[in-house]
Regions:
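Flexible gly/pro-rich beta->alpha loop and the following alpha-helix that scaffold active-site loops
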Residues: 30-94, 106
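Structured adenosyl-cofactor binding patch, chiefly the S-adenosyl-L-methionine
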Residues: 102-103
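Glycine-rich beta-alpha loop elements in corrinoid/cobalamin-binding modules
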Residues: 115-117
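Post-Walker A helix-loop "phosphate-sensing" segment adjacent to the P-loop in P-loop NTPases
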Residues: 107-113
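Amide-donor transfer/coupling interface in amidating biosynthetic enzymes
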Residues: 2-31, 38-39, 45, 84-87, ...
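Catalytic nucleophile loop
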Residues: 99
Length: 227
């Protein structure tokens, strides 16, 4: 069984977009099941512990994004999830907010990219108004090769929706991607199947299929695809 951690803040589901978020989580769950041929269980972030993952016989952990900023979470609610991912007991893939969870779990500060300059136009004023951000399907410059990045070319198009970023690379990880706005886009652990992306590969489309390729590569190398 795969575990897909719903990293959405518990207050978000009471908001007007709560049902859309849940629908998106279910769609991603089905995509992971279709890619691997295995079952996938959605578990809320504040319920994850190593004991639960062992009880579920989890084969891997996928961590969703979130509409909330990282500083809105109670650190106590993330202890179990942080303990699980840093134990290196399971393959882990963090998407956007999940990437930021990984960064924090491994000791790296996460903070806003920064405010727009006075002469900069805010092209997406309904998303993090006044802040530097990335939003939409945009190219990611790959800075070095890795088996997980096979088939992506030099600048795959991925879905972006973030105004926060990891401010450094965690120990035992390397960064494999960058953009002009945010230099840390892909963290891959040097010895364990742990990856995080600041973007959303799980929102791949027929027009922009690179996210599917990346997730498939991870699932294949982690031994998650049933033959």
């Amino acid at each position: 069984m795969l575990v897909f951690v719903d990293n959405e803040h518990i207050d978000a589901y009471a908001k007007s977009w709560g049902e859309k978020i849940m629908a998106a989580r279910v769609r991603i769950k089905y995509r992971l099941e279709d890619l691997t041929g295995d079952h996938c269980l959605i578990v809320r972030y504040n319920q994850v512990t190593p004991a639960l993952l062992n009880q579920l016989e989890a084969k891997a952990i996928f961590i969703s994004g979130s509409s909330a900023n990282p500083d809105e979470y109670d650190p106590a609610d993330l202890i179990g999830l942080h303990t699980a991912v840093t134990s290196k007991q399971w393959p882990v893939f963090g998407f956007c907010g999940g990437f930021e969870v990984l960064a924090e779990a491994f000791g790296i500060a996460v903070a806003p990219i920064g405010p727009l300059a006075a002469d900069e136009t805010d092209h997406n004023p309904n998303f993090a108004p006044g802040m530097k951000k990335e939003f939409g399907y945009l190219p990611i410059k790959l800075t070095k090769s890795h088996p997980l990045l096979a088939g992506l070319g030099d600048a795959p198009i991925m879905r972006q929706a973030h105004s926060w970023e990891a401010k450094a690379v965690p120990k035992d990880f390397e960064n494999y991607g960058e953009t002009a706005v945010s230099h840390h886009q892909i963290f891959i652990h040097n010895t364990h199947p742990i990856i995080g992306t600041q973007f959303h590969p799980e929102y791949y489309t027929d027009e922009h299929p690179s996210g599917r390729t990346l997730i498939h590569n991870f699932c294949q190398q982690a031994g998650l695809i049933k033959q």
